[in-house]
Regions:
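Glycosyltransferase donor-sugar binding loop
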Residues: 191, 220, 247-265
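Short hydrophobic beta-strand element within catalytic cores of glycosyltransferases
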Residues: 311, 320-323
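Conserved donor-binding/catalytic core segment of Leloir-type glycosyltransferases
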Residues: 7, 211-227, 233-236, 249
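Conserved acidic donor-binding segment of nucleotide-sugar-dependent glycosyltransferases
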Residues: 335-336, 340-347, 355-361
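Short alpha-helical donor nucleotide-sugar binding micro-motif in glycosyltransferases
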Residues: 282-283, 290-295
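Nucleotide-activated donor-binding/catalytic signature segment of Leloir-type glycosyltransferases, i.e.
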Residues: 261-283
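N-terminal subdomain of nucleotide-sugar transferases
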Residues: 1-66, 71, 396
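Aromatic "clamp/platform" in nucleotide-sugar-dependent glycosyltransferases that forms part
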Residues: 303
Length: 400
């Protein structure tokens, strides 16, 4: 495979102020960089969701992260701007990329998410006569329902040289929105096997301060409504009413989709679960793997996802998963030997599945083998192939 120069565009690439942001983008690009040259443009919003804590003046304009050279140009994000935010992003990046291209003559633009990056990539691809790709990761299903955003998302999708989707459901979504089948490839996310592997349960629980004699549920993700931690709290209340001594560990910190942490604490107090629900805040990936190894079951109660990495990461640690039927979950839990899938929003079904998972004797070695089957190295190779194909195409070289 001949190497090409890739310019990757992502507003969710991890940065020094938000280390837990979009690790799936970073993992993929680190392995793509073993095949192609990769430079990352990860714009930082000057006003991000109008929340002061997301204004990040301390982030460097450029930095090196292993094989990746990363640029952090600033741009003004207008949360009320709708589809115009994508145009604001493209307008800000136009002069920046003119300067960058004098030093780095990129062959293809690799954008993550259709909005705002994919629309911006289509505009930039037209200006620079450069092919571009879009990776669909799940939020497009919501954004396309907006008349303004939907029109421009479909416009960008049809003009991309290639579309990458992280699940088969998103592949079907792309095709239903006008993308040619031959231009879509599904490349699910991977797992880092050096981080996510089973730890000795007794020793790990002791180190984390988790009682050995209690069933443990772990719910991991940003403390935002979409992740559904509040639904797990309510499920725990139902489970404990049936006589179980189960406890819940919620792992994660504030996210970009609004403040929801206080609501979670109110929900805990409303059900008198203060002694049985534990908040850890943000943790490193290795510590997350510790909690997953210590868990009887990991729960994902999201209302919307693309390819939720937490499912395979938990399985790689040997933990069964109870998850709502969103995004690629059916592909990640294809059989009851790996966990249970329940309808999104059905809290009775969620509580029943968690109770059943706690009572089931699982083949944790089999769960581990399934969860570790797909590595980021494999993802990198497959993505590099698509980017090579895109760079050789003329479809993305639009007329200005």
């Amino acid at each position: 495979m001949q190497g090409v120069k890739v310019l990757s565009l992502s507003t969710v690439f991890p940065n020094p102020a938000e280390e837990n942001l979009g690790p799936f983008v970073r993992h993929r690009l680190q392995h793509v960089a073993k095949v192609h040259d990769v430079e990352v443009v990860a714009p930082i919003a000057v006003i991000d969701y109008a929340e002061r804590r997301f204004r990040r003046p301390g982030i460097p304009v450029s930095r090196q992260d292993g094989p990746l050279h990363i640029h952090h140009p600033r741009w003004v994000y207008l949360p009320w701007g709708g589809y115009t935010s994508a145009f604001c992003l493209a307008a800000r990046l136009m002069p920046f990329l003119h300067g960058l291209r004098r030093e780095y003559s990129f062959d293809v633009i690799d954008s993550h998410f259709a909005y705002p990056e994919g629309i911006a990539a289509a505009l930039l691809g037209s200006a620079f006569r450069c092919p571009f790709t879009i990776t669909l990761r799940g939020n497009e299903v919501m954004h396309v329902q907006s008349p303004g955003k939907g029109r421009w998302i479909r416009w960008a999708l049809r003009r991309a040289a290639r579309i990458i989707t992280v699940s088969e459901s998103l592949r079907r979504f792309a095709i239903s929105n006008g993308v040619e089948e031959t231009h879509v490839r599904t490349i699910p996310n991977g797992v880092d096997p050096d981080v996510f592997y089973p730890r000795p349960r007794t020793e790990t629980r002791f180190r984390l301060g988790i009682p050995e004699d209690r069933p443990v549920i772990v719910s991991a993700g940003f403390l935002i409504e979409r992740k559904g931690h509040h639904r797990v709290v309510r499920a725990l209340s139902e489970i404990r009413r049936s006589g179980s001594s189960a406890e819940l560990w919620i792992i994660g910190g504030p996210g970009r989709e609004g403040q929801f942490e206080e609501h979670l604490h109110r929900e805990v107090r409303r059900h008198a679960l203060e002694s049985f629900v534990h908040f850890t805040g943000n943790v490193k990936s290795a510590v997350l793997a510790d909690y997953m190894s210590a868990a009887d079951v990991v729960c994902l109660a999201s209302s919307r996802e693309g390819w939720p990495n937490v499912v395979h990461e938990a399985q790689a640690c040997g933990a069964p998963v109870v998850a709502t039927d969103v995004g690629g979950v059916q592909d990640m839990i294809p059989a009851a030997e790996y966990g249970f899938v329940v309808p999104a929003g059905d809290e009775d079904a969620l509580a029943a599945a968690l109770r059943k998972a706690i009572e089931t004797r699982w083949n944790r070695a089999g769960i581990t083998a399934w969860g570790r089957a797909r590595s980021w190295q494999q993802v990198g190779v497959e993505t590099a192939e698509v980017l090579s194909q895109a760079a050789a195409e003329t479809k993305g070289r639009l007329k200005p």
